[in-house]
Amino acid sequence: MKFDPEQVKLETKEDFDRAWSTSGKYVAQPDSTKDYTIHNEPGKAHPVYDTLNKLREAYINLGFEEMVNPIIIEESDIFRQFNYEALAVLDRVYYIGGLPRPNVGISDERFAQIEQIFGRSLTDSDKETIREILHKYKKGEIEGDDLVADLSAGLQIQDSKVAVMIDHVFPEFKKLEPVCSRKTLRSHMTSGWFITLGAMVDRRTTPLKLFSVDLVFRREQEENADRLRAYHSASCVIMDPDVTVEHGKAVAAGLLRQFGFSQFKFKPDDKRSKYYTPDTQIEVYGYHPALKGSNTKYKDGWVEIATFGIYSATALSQYDIPYPVMNLGLGVERLAMILHQAKDMRDMVYPQFKEEWDLTDAEIARMISMEKHPQTKEGHDIAMAIIATVERNGSAPSPCRFDVWEGTINGKKIKVYLEEKEEGKKLCGGAIMNEAYVYKGDLLGIPLNNPKFAEVAEKGAPTGIRNIDAIANAAARNIEEGVYETTVKMSRAPGDVYVKVDPVALRYIQGKKHKIDFRGPVFTSIKAELIE
């Protein structure tokens, strides 16, 4: 259930143990009348992972075998691969650090603090348990993830109190500063390929065709529309005594044709990375018809999309690899931007952090629902009977009454009917059959038979909810709860006709200054009466 974060923050600050221990009150209890089965329905793939999976399939279609390359690379490997370029490469890598294990001393004063937190005295056995477990932690025999649990089990005390003890009694833990190691996060997929090929060269025959699609990390000064600190590289290698740059061209064309690219240009890369053989480092440009005339910087249809080259013997020999190796790589996010015509990589990869967020009409429509639903079969039957009666007789002249349903619900025998007593009107108002649509960000209740709203009906996103649907279900639920009259007159907002707008959709619509318009004469009265 929904809770107030500010109130919980205050409670947590005052007494973490109590706030945490009682946080279960915010979790709804299972309702035996509800069906919690998760049914198959269309989901939505992220552009990056959609592209990533298609790249995996594309490589497999070309006969490549998928591998997982090491993601943690020793600094020494960078020097082996890049030689005197290594320092420039290392300037852009992330070194891995960790917190040292503190040498914790425990005085009588600290034991007194612990007793105050635990609310009980510590036995000699308890004190020895604390000393022993902290000593094992220092020696690395207990992992940080297990420290609280082991202390909790050893002392027979709630783990939340142990967490408070560590925070309050042992400031050494909070004063720790990370110590850097000589291990790095992979900045080039190439770093992993040398290690992988070095391990496989004596076990596999050539030609050996491998690929990997995975994360790489660069210590960029800042992220921008074209560059992120963490991104996915789709990389492949062919190890073969007779491999040439023509293999690189063939792989590039075979791979990218599967994504709609139809023409290719190959240009020497000015970077001349030292892990490639001189004059083999090639940039790949592809022409994609969908980009021609697009509102992007690729409007001429051409885009730089990949790079390939032949690994140098100077680098390969460091791993005892005696064969030339062609390597091709491309950025998954870059390809995803092209295929989805995105203008900013940050917004495409992390849409949840966009200052200017966007919802499609269909996404908003999925956030519109009926406010109430009957919980019994009889209630459901009542709702369906109300809807059927209005569909048949909604325009009947008044005064009029139409019996809808008769039966027993919750042990009471009742009769349900629709009624309009006033003369010169109809059983229901003209807006009773209006349906909720989302069009260009507006949420509208429209009559589908009115030509004025033909464009909305044709191009908008339907919610599938008519006024009568929501009202009938609400009336049925009211009857289940013993409320025997549901009357709606003029509608001005969704809530007037028991239509619910998710708070996210409401914030979006209001924030974008779109409108919600459910105005219309509904004028319907649904009643129930007890019968003998």
Curated annotation (Swiss-Prot):
Binding of substrate occurs at: H188, M189, T190, S233, A234, S235, Y275, Y276, N327
Q: What does this protein do?
A: Catalyzes the attachment of O-phosphoserine (Sep) to tRNA(Cys).
What family, per the record?
Belongs to the class-II aminoacyl-tRNA synthetase family. O-phosphoseryl-tRNA(Cys) synthetase subfamily.
Highest rank taxon of the organism: Archaea
Q: What Pfam families does the entry give? A: SepRS_C, tRNA-synt_2d
Q: Which residues cross the membrane?
A: none
Keyword presence, Aminoacyl-tRNA synthetase? yes
Protein name, per record: O-phosphoserine--tRNA(Cys) ligase
Q: Which GO terms describe its biological process?
A: translation; tRNA aminoacylation
Q: What class of enzyme is it?
A: ligase
Catalysed reaction(s)?
A: tRNA(Cys) + O-phospho-L-serine + ATP = O-phospho-L-seryl-tRNA(Cys) + AMP + diphosphate
EC number(s) of the enzyme? 6.1.1.27
GO MF, one annotated term: ATP binding
List the top taxonomic levels of the source. Archaea, Methanobacteriati, Methanobacteriota, Stenosarchaea group, Methanomicrobia
Please give the organism. Methanocella arvoryzae (strain DSM 22066 / NBRC 105507 / MRE50)
Q: Keywords, A to Z?
A: Aminoacyl-tRNA synthetase, ATP-binding, Ligase, Nucleotide-binding, Protein biosynthesis
Describe the protein's quaternary organization and the partners it interacts with. Answer: Homotetramer. Interacts with SepCysS.
